[in-house]
Amino acid sequence: MFAAAISLVGLAATVYLVLREAKAIRAQSGTVAKSALGWSVAFGLFQLFLTIWGAIGLVAQNEPLAFVMLILTNAILTGCAWASIARDRIAPRVFAFAKPDAPAPTGKLARLRGAFVGKPLVAAVLCLLLAGVFALLGMEVSSNHDFTWVYPLCILLEWAIITVLMVGLFFLFQRHGVAPAVLAFALFVLGIAEFFVITFKSMPIQPGDLSAISTAAAVAGTGYTFSISLFCVLSMGFTAIAMLLCEYAGLVAPHRQKGAANAKRMLLTNLLVAVLCLGGVTAHVTLIDYYNTLGITVYTWRPLESYWREGYLPAFISAAQSIKPPKPADYSVDDAKATLKKYAKAYDKSDAAKSDERTAAKEQFDSEKPTVIAIMNETFSDLSIYQNMRAGYEGPQYFKNLSNCLSRGKLYVSAYGGGTANTEFEFMTGNSMANLGSGVYPYTIYNMETTGNLAEQFKSLGYSTTAMHPNHATNWNRENVYKDFGFDQFLSINDFQGADTLRGMVTDQATYDKILELLDQNADPQFIFDVTMQNHSGYDTGLLPVDKQMHLNIDTTNLDAKTIEDGTLSDVDEYVSCIEQSDQALRYFLNALSKLDRKVVVVFWGDHQPFFPSKFNDKWFTNEDDATHQERLWQTDYIIWANYDVAGCDQTSEVDDLSTNYLSTQLMQLIGAPLTDYQKAHMTLRESLPAINSVGYEDASLRWALSSNVTGDDAAAAAATKAREDYAKMQYYEMFRDGKNVYTEHFQTEANETDPNLAPGTTKIK
């Protein structure tokens, strides 16, 4: 209760000082300005709020220096209230140097001082520059009070945005301080809202949340306790200082006088400055690419880290710029539909559609309806592509030596070191991240209800559909996306209680046992999508049993000293040990399926590489083009396997390298399943565009080019360019139709959390 007591005393002091000053003004035959009284009341209302909130126990009091922070904040609020009512006494003294008749400076630094002396407008702008600092603190400190890890340039950018907006509002409202003060208060409210959202969800307020404000308001009173921290209290103090500085800026600045000779010119000047400032900020946030140009990126798995390191406004702007899907040039729904129809017809006329092999596979599929199991194996990749890690490493041997696959090869993905959900999105929908821009995670942003996907497709064929992921259902918003996709059920960590674990993660084999259980319970055709968890980073846990540990004796001759010393080599050891366990689990699973008296197809692939191969790639592969160099990092491997003889297929593990967006089409083509028009278009696209991901694309001559650096002027390059343009058009139609219903209404309810043994958002950011 001492928070309420201190605030009540502060409020009493404010009332006393304001009344005393008002009495003194009247005693001198003066008049108390209503605006001055209004400012004082505003600061007093802060204290009244603290008194009430503290009285009902909603102000934290158990933090270090709580007593000091409460006294300091109330002293600031009382001081601001008094400075407002006494402004006619204080301002002339503080800004005496700015009076037009102030004596010219002499002595040292006279020229520098001359820039301020006798120039009241300059003094007003200086007040606003300082107000921007305190407004920034008023917004940030509530939830982000450790400034030791904030990037200085990002904070400087945030201050510049706030300050220029304040200056623009100041001049727009003809040099009055109310408008910039309202902005400072609005930023404070935003900071408090950010504090509550972080408290409840361990996530910041993000652009996508703006479309759910009404929903948030509806549930705000259900089960939440809106207790504020002492840093929120301190933010009030900073905001009050910002507001006071805005008030004083309005006092010192020269104002337009009606009827004066320069009144019209001053009006136009004010409006011009306002337009330049407000228009400049608008142009800045719309024309400058924060992600690619300024390097301000939001780490979407744990976005809170980005918002804390880069400042709320820069991170929010970067995220807002990224989420709007790029609309292809001259896009129209009719044109996109016509393009899709053209590509689908081209497939229908092709050998791939008319061949005897495809006909036989279709007849078999229609009569047999095999169960289809899709396994996206967490961080499964073959590091032997990096010169065998200069340690004789040969990769996962069982996986690499499977000789009876329908198809296998390199899989070019749109994720590296993380971003599982984007690889999943590409496989499930046939869409490519190459057409959605940088830093985008469709599961968390876009409306998936109308997006075609494999679960929906198999359900239309009479299949039951199951998704499983042995971690939190809320991660990457899967609980909502899987409903939108139409899965019949979603098995999450709650369905794997007591399952075997490795390094605290549910093992691959445990998920395979769950699949076998589902097959045993239901003889009807099923589509099962398994997103494993065993191999997730980090790789410095030290939790591997001794009998499962591998060690690579890597030749470190050409590696950086930092790579040798920062634990990367031990990370490699733990990672390849996990991959070995995945390889053995895959052997176990396929052997078990081989013994079943039912037809089963398995498509298995890795979602991305771990986070460290770039250190080896840059040192060991130095004389190659940029596209080849980069794509080595953005590839894993896939297999499509069946426990029966698929009609029309030799099943000799024919190599067919492709990208994740084509993988589901490849699966359906090989097993004889019906293709959607979009999948038929994929088959046609592959003739000119064999692979594409967020980094680059491959043309028909098997030449890679970076997406940002189109090369080649031959027929293959031209065909690939045309195919990319048509693909972007078709994908926009498939996802967004006319572009009026782009964003999801089913938002992620909890922060992402790697550790399935902890509540969402528990892991603290380092």
Describe each PLM feature range.
Residues K201, L210-A217, F316-K324, A336-S350, ...:
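Short alpha-helical interface patches
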Residues A81, I90, V94, L112, ...:
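Generic structural signal of hydrophobic/aromatic residues within well-ordered alpha-helices
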Residues V164-L165, S367-K369, L596-R598:
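Short hydrophobic "helix-edge" motifs at membrane interfaces and signal-peptide entry regions
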Residues K99-D101, A253-M266, D334-D366, Q521, ...:
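Intrinsically disordered, low-complexity coil segments
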Residues T282-A374:
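Membrane-interface segments at or immediately adjacent to transmembrane helices
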Residues D351-Q364, A374-N377, D382-K766:
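Solvent-exposed soluble domains appended to multi-pass membrane proteins
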Residues M1-S306:
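Transmembrane and membrane-interface helices of multi-pass
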Residues A186, L210-I213, R309-F316, V333, ...:
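Alpha-helix initiation and N-capping motif
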